[in-house]
Structure formats: C-alpha cells, structure tokens
Amino acid sequence: MEGDGVPWGSEPVSGPGPGGGGGMIRELCRGFGRYRRYLGRLRQNLRETQKFFRDIKCSHNHTCLSSLTGGGGAERGPAGDVAETGLQAGQLSCISFPPKEEKYLQQIVDCLPCILILGQDCNVKCQLLNLLLGVQVLPTTKLGSEESCKLRRLRFTYGTQTRVSLALPGQYELVHTLVAHQGNWETIPEEDLEVQENNEDAAHVLAELEVTMHHALLQEVDVVVAPCQGLRPTVDVLGDLVNDFLPVITYALHKDELSERDEQELQEIRKYFSFPVFFFKVPKLGSEIIDSSTKRMESERSLLYRQLIDLGYLSSSHWNCGAPGQDTKAQSMLVEQSEKLRHLSTFSHQVLQTRLVDAAKALNLVHCHCLDIFINQAFDMQRDLQITPKRLEYTRKKENELYESLMNIANRKQEEMKDMIVETLNTMKEELLDDATNMEFKDVIVPENGEPVGTREIKCCIRQIQELIISRLNQAVANKLISSVDYLRESFVGTLERCLQSLEKSQDVSVHITSNYLKQILNAAYHVEVTFHSGSSVTRMLWEQIKQIIQRITWVSPPAITLEWKRKVAQEAIESLSASKLAKSICSQFRTRLNSSHEAFAASLRQLEAGHSGRLEKTEDLWLRVRKDHAPRLARLSLESRSLQDVLLHRKPKLGQELGRGQYGVVYLCDNWGGHFPCALKSVVPPDEKHWNDLALEFHYMRSLPKHERLVDLHGSVIDYNYGGGSSIAVLLIMERLHRDLYTGLKAGLTLETRLQIALDVVEGIRFLHSQGLVHRDIKLKNVLLDKQNRAKITDLGFCKPEAMMSGSIVGTPIHMAPELFTGKYDNSVDVYAFGILFWYICSGSVKLPEAFERCASKDHLWNNVRRGARPERLPVFDEECWQLMEACWDGDPLKRPLLGIVQPMLQGIMDRLCKSNSEQPNRGLDDST
C-alpha cells in the first residue's frame, strides 16, 4: 500500500549528516552495479558449463543405449559386443560437474548482494541507515530501553513510489493497516517499526517491514536493518539471509568501547560465519565533526581497535581507518571518523570481489580439470589407435613363428625321440617291473591261496598293468620332450601373453573374456604334455601288443595271479613295444595338436581383431569429437572464467603504443598490469567460432605450462566486450615484454657466440614444449624474442598444440614448414625441421631469404618446391658441422631427423669449438656478424 508521504526522487537527497554525500552513494552504486554485471557473466558461464556437462552425459547415455541395442550394424562378437559401452563408460563418465562445486557456484549466482546493518542498539542502526541513504527516513530518537526494544527487521528496496508494507520474508504480504498509511509522514512512524507487545499473531511477529523507495542506491542493492537482539538473535538473522543474499555487513557503533553483550554477539557471528564486518562509529546527533587528529579520538579509537583485534576481526598489520590494502581477500574495517564513511564503498568492493574471484576460480578449476582429462584421453586414444593394430600384427607374427618352430621340432626329432624312448625304457625297466609286481589291482578279487581266476579277471589285471606302464612312460617321455622345446615356450609364449594382456587393457569385460580364452588356448596348445588317451594310435598299438600277450597266456589255462605272473606280464609288455613306431606316433599326434591349436589361436585372434576393429572405430569417432567439439567448447568456457578472474583482480589493462601487427591480432605496449612491468598486450579479435576455439585452447596450453626461462611468460587474459567501441569482442593476452625479436636482432648484427647461444636457447625451449606433449608448429625468426642480454625466448604459441589434439591442419610459415605438414600427418619432428631452417639464418647472420625460396613467386610454388626437396643453399661461410646439422634437421624423412636431445650437445660442441677457435683464428668457418 502506498503512503501519502512525499516520494524521493531519482537522485538521492543528501542529508545534513556527515556521511551522506552523493559521492559515496555514487561509488557504492558503481561498485554494486559492477558486481551485478560480472555476476551476470559468471551466471552465463555457469549455465553454459552445466549445459556442456548435460550434453556430454546425453552423448554418453545415447552411445551406451545404441551399443546395448546393437545399433549401427557393426560386426559384433564376444570381444566387441559391448565394447562401445565400455569405451564410452571409461572415457566419458569421468567428465562431470562435481556436485559440491556445482551447488556452491549455483548458490553464489543465485544470491544477490544486500547491505546488512547491525549495531550496538536500534537507534544507532537507524542513524547509519539515514547516513547511507542521505535522507532522514527512520526516527533516531530513543525507541525505548534496549531491553524492551522490539524493532522488527526492516528491508529497503527499490520502487518507483514510496511504499510501506508488512511481509513475511520471501513469501507474501500481510494485510495489515499501518500508521504510515493513515497520513503524511517524514520519517516512518515508530509504531510501524516495532512489534506490538499484545500481538500474538506469529506471522505478524516474524514479518519484516518492507519499504520501497525511488533511490539510486536501492536500484543496485537492498538494505536490511537487523531486528533488535531481544526479538531475534543476530546469528539467526544472518543464517536466514545467507541462503538468498550475499550480505555486506556493517556494524554501527556509538560508544567508546564494546559492551560484554556486543562482544558476545560478535563472537557468535565470527564462530558461525566467515564474513568480514565494516565497523563504523556513528557521530552523536547534533555534534560537530571531530578532528581526527585529537589525542582523545586516538585513544578512543585504539580501545575499540584493541577489542576488535582480540575478537579476531582486525589484524595489527592493517590500518584501522579502512584504507584499502593489497590483499585480494576482504578484511574487516574499523572507521571511527564519521567523514570516512565513504570507505564503505572500498569495503563492499572487496567483499564483492572476493566472492566473485573465489567463484570464478572454482569454476575455472572445474574447466581446467576436465580439459586436462580430455587432453590426456586424446593422448590415450591416439596411442590406442596407433599401437593396437601393431600389437595384433605382432601377436599374429610371433604365434606363427612359434608354431613353425615347434612343427620343425616335431618333424626333425623323430629319430631323437626314438632314442629317447629306448633310453627311457632301459632306464625305467626295473622300476616299472617292480611297480607292476607290487601293484594292487582295483575291482579284482585275488584269492589269497593262489587259486587261478577267470579270464575276465585276468584281462582286467593285464589292462591295469598296461595303464600303469603307459602312464609312467608317457610322463617320462613328456618331461624330456618339454625340456627340448621349453626355451621356445619361454621366449614365445611369454611374449605373446604379455602382448595379449596389453590388448585387453582398458577394455570391456567381454574383451577380457575373449583374451582370457585366447590365453587358455595358447597355454593348452604349447604347454607340451604328451598324454595318450584311449583313442590314440599309441594306445591302440600297445593294446594290440598286449592282447597278443593275453592270448598266449590265457588260452592255455587260467593262471594264478602271483607276483611272478605280474612281473612276467609287465616284462613281455615292455619287450614287445616298438620304439620307432611309438616315436612316430608321438610326433604325429604332436603335429596334429599343434595344427589344431594353431587354427584355434588364429580363429580367436580374428575374433579379437574384429572386436578391436569396432572399438577402434568408435575410439576414432570419440577422438574426433574430443578434438573438434568437446575440448574447444570447454576451453572457451575456461578462457572466459579465467579472464573474469583476471579482470576482477587486476582490472582491464590500458593499451599503450602499438608494437606490431600479426595475422590475427595487434601487439601493444602495456606499462603495468597485475604487478608485472613492463608488459606486452596482444589483442586478438577471433573472426569466427573456429578461431575462438583455437585461441581458447592456445590459452589453456600456455596457462598450463610451468614457467620456463626459454618461453615468454603469459601473465593473464581479459575479454574486452566493448572492443572497438563495442563493435567486437577481443581477447587481451598480457605477456612478458622483451627487447626485440630475432629478425630485428639479426638485422642489427649479432656476434657468432651470441647467435649460437640463441640457437641453444631455442632448442632448449622446443625440447621443453615437446616434454610437455606440445608441438609449436611455427618456429621462425619473429617468434623468437630476445631480452636485453640477447638470450632467446620462444613466443606465439598460437599454433601450439598437443600431438594428440592436432587435426592435421596446414599451419605455420611457408619457408619453415616441413613437407609432411602438407599431408596432414605429422608429429613433433616438424619443429626440428623448422629449427633447421632457423639455424640456416642464424649461421648466415642475415635475414636474406635462401635463393631456393626467393625464386618462388607464390606460396603454392614454394610449397611444391619444398615437397620436391628444395632446401636452402650452402653459404661459403658455413662450417661443415653446422651444414651437416642443418641438412639432418630438414631431412625430408621425419624419421631421419635427429632428436633435439642429440642436437643440443652437438650445438654446444660447435659453439665451444668455433668460439674458442675464433679468439685465436678469426673467420674460421662462420662470419662474426657484428
């Protein structure tokens, strides 16, 4: 309901009090408005981040569903049936928004700021509100004793007209007639501010008085005056408030010291909350502004100051007047001079900035963590795509070698096996006879008095003697045969098993089953145990021979089963064995089992290969999505969150003199930013989405790199949404500023020793990039910067990418580009090639183009010549070893280029030799260009 009082205008009216200047209100409005703008950007980034993770989850679930339902029509088997599901589950499920961080960030973007006024009593709280608004809106006369005070919670918010109403916080307005509704008023009537003692309505007691005003400050932030302690404890008020608001807490003081009750209240606030507090000593009504230099003021201030230090709100290292410090974290302030209420804008800025910086940092950590996972997975997927086919081929080759070796053994060792069987029989004969003599028959009742038994019992006894001889003989022959091929089993089977284990790594359970089955076949095939089953030719041969013995023995008369009889049966069975036939049979069976196992192995390997083929196809698809969609999209969000953090901490940099222009940006001088001096600022306006993504990934790689003395430092980034008068969005990259680039240095003239040291510095920088998995792809004169001591640093990582994230795009500077760059299939050896060209310039001491390149009329002409083998010419000043190093580096075959770990000591040796010899014999090989 509207009151009849005169409404405040859009411009706040400055009251007579010492704190109510329009300047302070403008500063507060500017600070809270800035917070709202940056909070909006944070909210937008969080919303897009949540959408990104939802899209990843949907993609994961969709792929899993299509895999389980057999979509796509791909060939499936035990190895590939659920391989796609396993692939996605293993590589996408770990990419998710951590619930704790998401909840924290969502709470921050949902909470708008408010100024909360606490104080020693209700009068001083009302007085501070009037000072803040610059108008006398609340009565400052005594509302009653502090113990009997019933001031309800007050909320001041923006509206086009002045309006006073009762409402439950965050719920609905109460229908209640207020005194303010009944006539004109200058200050809100005391009756409306207090909870009436005789009112038993719980809703009425909990309700807050909501005042809407047309006021500049309230357009940006609500102001809440806490109820008196007797009505509701401050801790409870804060607890309700922090769920929906970010409180900027002010504490109004009017006494020279804190009472015991004040200290208890502040201790509880500090115990349950971590918010800083702005303590302000409100001047007494009607008093003049007290000279801050008086000793009385100093002593009073120091008493409050000491109390707040004891309570942990202030630190002895911070000046209590509220002057802003260098800390990024907001600190509590004590302002005892009423004319310095303007420091509230500094305090609120610190509180709001701390909140935003912490949130931006937390969000950026989520981005960077998931981005690193993407990049690591890209490496794993790329390696999987490269190594799995090689492993399968290696497994097939090694198994075939093992099969042929064992087959050769079976073919050529028949005579050896015959001799081995004869030797084994001779060695074991007595042992076998003794074992047969002492043998206890199963399922045959032998009369103890030596009476003859029937033919059936005789046959059973002879069969058991036969089985004993066969089992013992088989075991002995097998042991000797195994020892003859054991070295093959160790060298081949062990290697094969290790290779199979690598093939099953990171695969689904179904692939594990296939690989385990394959290993079982492998062990069964090559663990050479020569056992003769009842259907084998060896057993049939032995059985025929022993049947003849039975016929000779049994058809005369049924014998008595005595020790002598058992020995005689065993003797005749052993003597009737043919070693040559037995050897031939063993080798034949060995070959049969080898063939069978070899075929089973090959079939199972084909099955595994089919499973891997389907899996690798899915891996390649996922690898492409990671490189072209997931990682760039997340990198852009990461760039935005990090740039928000940087602009909050260090503000937007000021552009100085233009230093140079490149293909995608302009480089400016920047005197000072973020504590770094001097700086270079590269302003990049990405023309399209692809360039945005490339820039974002470049920024991530640069920020992820540890600092290195051979790389130019990147200090930070800021996104300028109003670049060029608001016509475009630019990314401002703030970097270390160096003296000049190598191109300029060579034109000015550098000594031989300096040039060779620069070459060593460049190699060291490239080696570091390669050690981090990165490929620069654009090593050239202008991308090597020199400091004042002419030590080199590599810059412009615009084309720099991890090998696994390279799409095969043609990038770089034509004369420094390796031939394989044009095919789209290349690795970090392209940097070795580019260094070879750079080294040509370094050794020449000039920036003049090589003749082979200078004759080219166009880039296409140059590229065609490079592909056909055109290289820089040898200059007369070149040292032989330098020329050989150049030629090796720019070799057309990437595999023949030297590793930089070999190039570096070679360069050091060249430098030691030439520079030492130059001091004695000038101009020996290379000009000393000065």
UniProtKB/Swiss-Prot annotation:
The keyword Cytoplasm applies. Acts as a positive regulator of ERK phosphorylation downstream of fibroblast growth factor-receptor activation. Involved in the regulation of both caspase-dependent apoptosis and caspase-independent cell death. In the skin, it plays a predominant role in suppressing caspase-dependent apoptosis in response to UV stress in a range of dermal cell types. GO terms for molecular function: ATP binding; protein serine kinase activity; protein serine/threonine kinase activity; protein serine/threonine/tyrosine kinase activity; protein tyrosine kinase activity. It is an enzyme of class 2 (transferase). Belongs to the protein kinase superfamily. Ser/Thr protein kinase family. CDD domains: PKc_Dusty (cd13975). This is Dual serine/threonine and tyrosine protein kinase. Residues 190-216, 396-432 form a coiled coil. The lineage of its organism: Eukaryota, Metazoa, Chordata, Craniata, Vertebrata. GO terms for cellular component: anchoring junction; apical plasma membrane; basolateral plasma membrane; cytoplasm. The gene is DSTYK. SUPFAM superfamilies: Protein kinase-like (PK-like). It is found in: Cytoplasm; Cell membrane; Apical cell membrane; Basolateral cell membrane. It comes from the Eukaryota.
